[in-house]
Every structure is written in C-alpha cells, then in structure tokens.
Amino acid sequence: MSLRGLRRWWRSLASVSPYDEPELVSLDIETTSLDPKSAEILSIAAVPVRGRQVVLSERFERIVRAGAAEVDPEAVKFHRLLPSDIEHGLPPQQAVTEFVAWLGERPLLGYCIGFDCMMLERAAQWAGGGLLDGRRFDIREIYRRRMLQRNPDDHPSQVLDDILTALDVPPVGRHTAVGDATAVGLAFLALKYARPRRVAS
C-alpha cells in the first residue's frame, strides 16, 4: 500500500460515520446503460455538502465524450444529454482527472456509489484501481441504518425515489447528474438534522 493509501485507510478508521465528516461530496454520474461491462460515462457531477447546505455554487460538472457505446434514445428523455452535447464533451480520462483534482481528500457520498467509482476508475484507465480509494458512503446504507434504528422490524426501500419521498426531499432534476447529486446531498442532510434542508446558490 502506498503512503497516500495508508493515510486514507487510517483516516477511514478514525471516521467511520458520515455524520462525523465536516464535509462530504455528493457524486453522481450518468452512463449509457447500467451494465458495468459495456456502459460509458456521459456526465459527472458533484456538489459539496457542508454544514446544513448543499453548496451548488461550488459544484463540479462535466459532460464526457462517449466512445463506441450507443446512447439509448429513451434515456435522453431523462438525462437530457443530446448526441451533440456528448460529441463535444471531454475525453473520459481528462474529465476524471479533473474531478479527482477537484475532489481532493474529501469523502464521497452517493447512491450506488460503488458503481460510480468503478466507472470513473475504468474511464481513467488507471490499472489496479486506487484512484478513488478514500472514504465513501452510500445513501442507501445510511438511510437503512437510520430507519432500522427507529424501527428494527422495518424493511426500508432502497429505491432512490422512495428514499426521497420518505425524507420529504423534492426531486430536483432527477436523472441528471447534478440533480441526483443534489437530491442525495439533501437526503443526507434530512437524515442528519431531521429538519428542513436548503440549497445554497
């Protein structure tokens, strides 16, 4: 393990709860499909979650140039990325490199965060992984644990729309990368503070 990896591992032991983090970065990516073997990234978005706010003014947002994979025409209705947008996007490796530089040492938050990180590492073509080996938290698990604390017999849904509805979080641009990243950030704040959330412009 590299020295950098060792430092990240040590910090992960020191802070095992997302509620202890002074700042998280809520990440979401849009892809050509959900098949990890063939999918390609179309867009990357991330927003800082700091204090009681999702800080949209400091967001990271990039459109990525897809390669050979075809974009599902039906999916365009949701992620709203036209072929012309994707054609003029950044090369995947450049987009991911810029994201990693922007992210720094901050821990990640997301929905199915493991899939997103795997896709980013593959797009960067960095053998052996480790590109995003810092702390990461999945809103599904955070939500599940909180619901089971309230009712051990509960069987909380793991569907994002259900989580948002249960937490009274309005869907903001669902199925766009920045919209979903924002929604997950607001869901986390709802779980942490159990009071109204707001987006900082």
Feature annotation, model-predicted:
Residues 176-187:
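Acidic, divalent-metal-coordinating active-site segment for phosphoryl/phosphodiester hydrolysis
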Residues 4-121, 125-126, 133, 157-175:
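Conserved non-catalytic scaffold segment of RNase H-like nuclease domains
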Residues 34-36, 144, 186:
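Conserved protein kinase catalytic core
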